[in-house]
């Protein structure tokens, strides 16, 4: 991919990935996309400064947030932690059919002014509004790449046709398609769904043709060990890590969860041993 030859893009990507080529990134866009009720399990985390301070202290590799949160709490992201600014989003206040489109909240220049190391946008592959999001992503990627900034695509298959043909949006065939479409549309990093098994996720990674694939953390699991096991399978499948929100900020002990995830992602530790070491089980 021509963009990956750009020194600026390569250097900024390294802000997120350690020498092992893997990353653990904290997601902080839920207040907008899901609403503040997502923070009710641990209400103090509704304050972005509080939770970002905790995750940075625990050793997170990168933090993803929307532009407004970057203005409010961006100072909590230390210089050795990658900052990813997501330029598109939507709320759950819309009627369901209208939730298949993410609108642009800000521009590449805004993200750069906020100190972004990478710029992110979502495409709902298979949505009736897919063409609008493709155009948005293309414009963001083209301009960001011209300025030497990597672009992350949240590649989410979603829509009535997906449900009708594949039964669920996590079917590996459609996740694999979305990952390939993300790579072919110019993404430098891909965030997408877990497909349910190491074998199927390996196909998603291969379909992305060398672009790093990170798993979307999804809903909080009741047992922390269950989530650690999934992340371990992602790594075993050749995935490059995870972008995690609720499985961190909805827990009373987010620092322990992050340290356990670091053990699994960066040290290749057994999930159960990692959980025990951090007091999660």
Swiss-Prot record:
Location(s) in or outside the cell: Cytoplasm
Catalysed reactions listed for this entry: beta-D-fructose 1,6-bisphosphate = D-glyceraldehyde 3-phosphate + dihydroxyacetone phosphate
Matches recorded under Pfam families: DeoC
Residues forming coiled coils: none
Active site, renumbered: 191 (schiff-base intermediate with dihydroxyacetone-p)
Activity control: Activated by citrate.
GO molecular function ontology, one term from the record: fructose-bisphosphate aldolase activity
An example Gene Ontology CC term for this record: cytoplasm
InterPro entries the UniProt entry points to: Aldolase_TIM (IPR013785), DeoC/FbaB/LacD_aldolase (IPR002915), DeoC/FbaB_aldolase (IPR050456), FBA_class_1 (IPR053414), FbaB-like (IPR041720)
EC nos: 4.1.2.13
Highest taxon of source: Archaea
UniProtKB keywords: Cytoplasm, Glycolysis, Lyase, Schiff base
One biological process term in Gene Ontology: glycolytic process
Keyword Kinase: no
Subunit structure, interactors included: Homooctamer.
NCBIfam families associated with the record: Fbpase1_Arch, PRK07226.1
Record protein name field: Fructose-bisphosphate aldolase class 1
Protein encoded by which gene: fba
């Amino acid at each position: 991919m021509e963009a990956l030859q750009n020194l600026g893009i390569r250097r900024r990507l390294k802000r997120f990935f350690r020498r092992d080529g893997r990353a653990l990134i904290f997601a902080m866009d839920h207040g907008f996309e899901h609403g503040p009720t997502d923070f009710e399990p641990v209400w103090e985390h509704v304050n972005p400064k509080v939770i970002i301070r905790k995750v940075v202290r625990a050793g997170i590799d990168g933090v993803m947030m929307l532009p407004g949160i970057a203005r409010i709490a961006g100072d909590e992201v230390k210089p050795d932690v990658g900052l990813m600014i997501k330029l598109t989003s939507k709320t759950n206040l819309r009627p369901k059919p209208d939730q298949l489109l993410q609108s642009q909240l800000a521009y590449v220049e805004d993200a750069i002014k906020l100190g972004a190391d990478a710029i992110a946008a979502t495409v709902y592959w298979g949505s009736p509004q897919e063409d609008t999001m493709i155009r948005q992503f293309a414009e963001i990627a083209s301009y960001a790449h011209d300025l030497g900034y990597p672009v992350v695509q949240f590649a989410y298959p979603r829509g009535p046709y997906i449900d009708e043909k594949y039964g669920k949006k996590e079917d590996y065939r459609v996740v694999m398609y979305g990952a390939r479409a993300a790579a072919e549309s110019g993404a430098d990093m891909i965030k997408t769904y877990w497909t349910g098994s190491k074998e199927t996720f390996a196909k998603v990674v291969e379909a992305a043709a060398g672009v790093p694939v990170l798993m979307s953390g999804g809903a909080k699991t009741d047992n922390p060990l269950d989530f650690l096991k999934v992340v371990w399978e992602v790594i075993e499948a050749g995935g490059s890590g995870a972008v995690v929100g609720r499985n961190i900020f909805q827990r009373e002990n987010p620092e322990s969860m992050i340290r356990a995830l670091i053990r699994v992602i960066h040290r290749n530790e057994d999930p159960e041993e990692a959980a025990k070491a951090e007091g999660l089980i």
